[in-house]
Amino acid sequence: VYFRLTVEGETVRNVELTSGHVHRGMEAMATQRNLIKNTTLTERVCSLCSNSHSFTYCMSVENVLGITIPERARYLRVLAEEIKRVASHLFNTAIQAHIIGFKSLFMHVMEVREMMQDVKETVYGNRMNLASNCIGGVKCDVERDMLDYILGMIAKVEPAVDEIREIYDTNSLV
C-alpha cells in the first residue's frame, strides 16, 4: 500500500491511496496462462494436497462460467480427493512420530501410506500429482475392476490405521 500525502504544516489535506498486490511466483505465472493450463499449475502449489487445489480451481472456474459437470464426474473428483486425503493424513501422522523420535512408528505409518501411494499410482498413473481434474469434469474414469482394487486396498489400510490410532491413543511415548 502506498500513500501520497498532501500536507500543510501538520495538517493532512489530501491522501492518494495506491493499493494492490505484487504478483510473484505462481500468481504471476497464472496471469500469463489460460484457464486450462492453470489447472496443471494449481496442482503444483503443494504436493501433499495437489488434488485439492485443482479440484477447487476447477469448481471456481465452472461456477463463474456456469458449467454444470456430470454427476459421475463429481463422484470421481471426490474419490480422487479422498484417496489423496488419506495418503496425506498418513504422511502427517508419520511426521509426528518422526518429530518425537518414534522411528519405528514413523516407518510403520509410512509403510501404510505406501499402500495409498500404490493406489494413486495404479488408478491415476502418478504418486503425487494425480492430474485427474479438468474444467468440466475429470480426465479419467474409474472402471469396476479399478474400484474393486481400491476397495481391496482400503480393506488392508483400515485395520492398519486402527492399529496406528491405538498406538497414538495408548502409548506413553506419544
Per-region residue spans from a language model:
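Active-site bordering "gate/hinge" segments
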Residues: 1-174
